[in-house]
Amino acid sequence: MALSINSEGNDVAKYVAARGVTGCVLKYRLAHTGEDATQEFGAMLADGQKFHEMLGKVVPLAVADGLAAVTYVRQHASEWGVSPDRVGIIGFSAGGAVTAGVAFHYLPEGWPAFVAPIYAGGEMSKDASVPVDAPPMFVAAATDDQLGLAPESAALYEKWTSAHKSAELHLYAKGGHGFGMRKQNLPTDHWIDRFADWLELQGWLQK
């Protein structure tokens, strides 16, 4: 597997940094692949059983990395001039699954101020309960997602709101999987602006 480190990582960090938010990009553990990760991933998707076996092995490790990252940033926030109570997490696709995992399984020292799973799978959150002190959630996905993750994204939103927790959902008609910060001349081009609007609404863009 591979990380989409630019359109779903560095570019997002640069966008929020321009609005006064410190962005950290996490490289979490992935399934082992050869040189052509895209080709191998496509073949794995064609074999549903093999794909889910892979997820069962790697997702817990990736979520553990996400949990550790939030805790680490909170513990070192004061050194970097960041408030530990304003540390949140956003992730896309597999990173969205990491974000969802953090949303459900954090410990007090790793409490995220907000969570934003974008076109996320929820392998570790399907049977999990919403935490009592769950943070606000922002969710976005495209209905024509090739991996079929729009329903899972909607399910995350529904689970949050059913527990009477704050959540916002954006489901786009088109955009496919992995739209991230890529420009496609579609409404998904502006999801990041809706995310910024939501951050401002929550008070996270105010110093």
Question: Where are the regions that the model predicts?
Answer:
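Serine-hydrolase catalytic machinery in alpha/beta-hydrolase-like enzymes
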Residues: 1-80
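Alpha/beta-hydrolase active-site loop signature
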Residues: 30-32, 122, 176
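Primarily recognizes the serine-hydrolase "nucleophile elbow" in alpha/beta-hydrolase
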Residues: 60-133
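C-terminal catalytic histidine-bearing segment of alpha/beta-hydrolase fold enzymes
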Residues: 39, 140, 161-207
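The feature captures the conserved acid-bearing segment of alpha/beta-hydrolase catalytic domains
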Residues: 113-171
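Generic structural signal for well-ordered alpha-helices
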Residues: 67-70, 157, 196
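Flexible, surface-exposed loop/gating regions in the mature catalytic domains
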Residues: 46-47, 53-56, 101-102, 126-131, ...
